[in-house]
Amino acid sequence: MDKKTKGSECESLVSEYLQREGHTILERNYRCPFGEIDILSLSSDGVLCVTEVKSLTRRWAADEVRYMVDGRKMMRLKKTLEHYLASGSKFRYNSIRFDVATVTDAHVTYYRGEF
């Protein structure tokens, strides 16, 4: 399986997980000149969630997850979100959170507020 197909399958698993948790999926693979957001969702309590999806060959310890997204990637995600919000999104949210979801052997682990 190529990297693009694997990534798409992992993002589908995470999207399904988020929907079961009460999220509304707003965008998948939102792209702009600044970068890409894997999944943008709105939680049932009004939190706008930017989720970076990582496919792993092994499970990581919870304290290792924060190292999966470096400073450059964080900046690109924030600029991409700013671009999305400036483009006229028509939904209301209470706050914004940046999360990481890992997928190992079709198992989703979701880390809230990792960066």
Predicted regions and their residues:
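Active-site metal-binding core of divalent-cation-utilizing nuclease and nuclease-like domains
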Residues: T24-L48
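Catalytic cores of nucleic-acid endonucleases
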Residues: S55-T104
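Positively charged, solvent-exposed patches that mediate nucleic-acid binding
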Residues: P33, S43, F91-R92, E114-F115
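Short, low-complexity, polybasic intrinsically disordered segments
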Residues: V103-F115
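Acidic-basic catalytic patches of nuclease active cores, encompassing PD-(D/E)XK
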Residues: M1-R28
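Conserved catalytic cores of phosphodiester-cleaving nucleases, focusing on short active-site segments
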Residues: I39-S41, D45-W60, L77
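Acidic active-site catalytic centers that drive phospho-/nucleotidyl reactions
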Residues: E11, E36-D38, E52-K54, D99
